[in-house]
UniProtKB/Swiss-Prot annotation:
Its EC number(s): 2.4.-.-
Coiled coil, from the record: none
Lumenal topological domain residue ranges: 28-631
Organism encoding this protein: Caenorhabditis elegans
Protein name: Glycosyltransferase-like protein LARGE
A Gene Ontology cellular-component term: Golgi membrane
Molecular-function GO term, any one: xylosyltransferase activity
Top-level taxon of the source organism: Eukaryota
Length: 631
């Protein structure tokens, strides 16, 4: 049976709409183990915003929590509007069975701390910790705040049990600050007051009932104003104000063992001040530390970076009614993955045109080559294991582009009876489309470099009418061993024509699969200086620009090699789309080794048969939905 509390609260929200925050419920049976009511679950609060790394660090942190604890978690995620949907998609797709979460709109509370002068890099996100007793609902008694740069090495429930040690006056639990900052030994800094070394606010245990009763909301503001008159601003953000408050109200703090916030910042003296074995590592510095023990602890952090998050919560395949005995079942890709949309970058303003693509680590160099040529926005989904995706994230960050948005899609473990995991190409395309903040999207694959006159492609895109797409001719080297310097082709149609006439370049797949791109009619393209229309032919699969709001999603049952683009273009034809060709732009294929799925297609007749069957089913279903009779 589900807990009466959960059911009652769910019904209250359903029928009265009185919940003050959005919630996703994942009901799980669990046994009451605690000494007071909150101990049958652990309630945690996070502030997630600012730099994209915050989301990646949150996932890294929560992996460490899940690794050592199977308790039930209730997370309170305090985010701004930009981050809420991304974190929601991460948590929903991760599908952790022993966790439910609630969102609180940080934007609504920003003004309550914006008046505080602050020179700390955390900006108002750090100061917002002061508002947690105001943000969290009045029906909640205890909660622990966590910075996302903390890695646990123990069961977090052991820390949660520290609430048992609070006396009647204690409202906060914190670890001592493991540096000399608040001692101000050199006397040169305008340091806020603190008890001794002060306390670090990376982890704060809040007794919310007592805080509300004691008038925290007004008292901390009085303290802040008092010391702002002296110091002018905060140097350590919220930590200065918390410590000044504790200085004035010393009976309200309980000191937590230092092992639960072993600080690794640039100024810390954790090794000499904390002899205990570290249980929670706090990487609380923008700069890498050069301490002797930092490298050792950084390896622990990197291990959680590389840890497969799916190992912490394995999920069932999302296919319903599939039978393991069906020979075609093993050729279907998974279609349920852990996702972080906008993991790197975000298109805050709608763009006119952006490239939409997808890739995995083995095609990273191709993406970098493509991105160097395409100077417009890019929305791309990236697929791989946790370690692979973080390596890719670092490489893309080094491009120093603000118009590239990366959506991370984490590879899932396959079932024992399945063949190798199929690359979920259409799932990835759909992710990249969904999160592209663009009016028009150029659908391409990452092993193509799009070249030509970008000014005219924007103009041609703007002239598209309803149910028209703009095809970008796809070309390739005639001989795979040829290596042409693509930088020479950036806007040189004349050079391309020269190579076409010399037969060193040809239409993509012209000899081995002519129906795929030959209908683009490259002979006409050579002579044209304006867009021209081409007829759809069977198995045509061009790359094209389309209005995003008109673009149907790709069928996610097609993964790896085989019919994944053909079926999408076929659907456009059934919807009466017209295919116009850009006379000024083109794309050139970057050679690469054959993928695993292509090799499988070539050697496995069952694979080919199953995908042909799936293609026919797709055609019939699409035709039926559109009211078309197939010939």
């Amino acid at each position: 049976m589900q807990s009466n509390y959960s059911i009652s609260y769910f019904l209250l929200i359903l029928f009265t709409g009185t919940s003050s925050y959005f919630t996703i419920w994942n009901f799980v049976d669990h046994t009451r183990v605690g000494a007071f009511p909150e101990e049958d679950y652990i309630r945690l609060a996070y502030i997630i915003g600012g730099n994209f790394m915050t989301r990646l660090m949150f996932m890294q942190h929560f992996k460490s929590v899940l690794k050592y604890s199977d308790h039930f978690f209730r997370l309170h995620l305090i985010t701004d509007e930009n981050h809420r949907s991304d974190i929601h998609e991460l948590m929903t797709s991760w599908n952790i069975s022993n966790c439910e979460w609630f969102f609180h709109n940080l934007t609504e509370f920003e003004k309550r701390v914006a008046w505080i002068p602050n020179s700390h890099y955390s900006k108002y996100y750090g100061l917002s910790k002061l508002l947690i007793p105001e943000i969290i609902g009045n029906d909640i008694g205890k909660i622990m705040f966590m910075d996302v740069d903390i890695i646990f090495q123990t069961n977090i429930f052991d820390l949660w049990k520290q609430f048992r040690n609070f006396n009647n006056s204690q409202v906060f639990g914190m670890v001592e600050n493991l540096s000399d900052w608040y001692l101000n030994k050199d006397g040169k800094k305008s340091v806020w007051p603190a008890l001794g070394r002060g306390f670090n606010t990376g982890i704060i245990m809040f007794d919310l009932d007592k805080l509300r009763k004691n008038g925290w909301a007004s008292k901390w503001r009085v303290v802040a104003n008092k010391y702002l008159r002296i110091h002018g601003k905060t140097a350590m953000s919220d930590q200065d104000i918390f410590n000044a408050y504790i200085h004035d109200y010393p009976t309200e703090i309980i000191q937590i063992p230092c092992a639960y916030n072993y600080q690794l910042g640039a100024l810390t003296k954790s090794k000499e001040l904390c002899p205990e074995t570290p249980l929670a590592l706090h990487f609380n510095s923008q700069n890498k530390t050069v301490g002797k023990n930092y490298a050792f602890f950084d390896k622990i952090r990197k291990a959680f970076d590389e840890m497969d998050g799916s190992d912490l919560k394995r999920r069932r395949r999302s296919f319903k009614g599939n039978n393991q005995k069906d020979i075609c079942h093993e050729y279907l890709p998974l279609d349920n993955f852990r996702i972080i949309p906008n993991a790197i970058g975000r298109m805050t303003k709608p763009a006119e045109l952006c490239m939409v693509t997808q890739f995995s680590k083995d095609r990273l160099n191709h993406f970098l080559e493509s991105a160097n040529a395409w100077r417009h926005p890019i929305s791309t989904a990236v697929y791989g294991k946790d370690k692979d995706l973080l390596d890719i994230a670092k490489a893309v960050t080094e491009l120093n582009r603000t118009d590239i948005t990366i959506h991370l899609v984490f590879e899932e473990p396959t079932e024992s009876w399945m063949l190798d995991s199929l690359y979920p190409i259409n799932f990835l395309r759909n992710v990249a489309i969904e999160h592209a903040n663009c009016k028009y999207i150029l659908m391409t694959d990452v092993d193509f470099v799009v070249l030509g006159d970008y000014g005219t492609i924007i103009d041609q895109t703007g002239n598209l009418k309803q149910k028209e797409v703009l095809v970008i001719p796809a070309l390739e080297m005639t001989y795979p061993q040829l290596r042409l310097n693509l930088s020479n082709f950036l806007s040189r149609k004349d050079l391309v024509i020269e190579h076409l006439l010399n037969k060193t370049i040809q239409t993509f797949r012209e000899t081995i699969w002519p129906s795929s791109h030959v209908p683009t009619n490259i002979s006409k393209w050579i002579k044209s200086n304006r867009t021209y229309m081409v007829n759809y032919e069977k198995n045509y699969e061009p790359y094209f620009v389309i209005k995003k709001e008109e673009c149907p999603f790709y069928d996610q049952r097609f993964g790896g090699f085989g019919w994944n683009k053909v079926t999408h273009v076929m659907q456009l034809k059934m919807m009466n789309y017209k295919f116009l060709v850009s006379p000024t732009s083109f794309m050139i294929h970057q050679n690469h080794n054959a993928s695993k799925s292509l090799k499988r297609w070539r050697r496995d007749p069952h694979y080919q048969k199953c995908l042909h069957t799936l293609k026919n089913k797709f055609m019939k279903k699409t035709a039926s939905r559109l009211g078309i009779k197939l010939r």
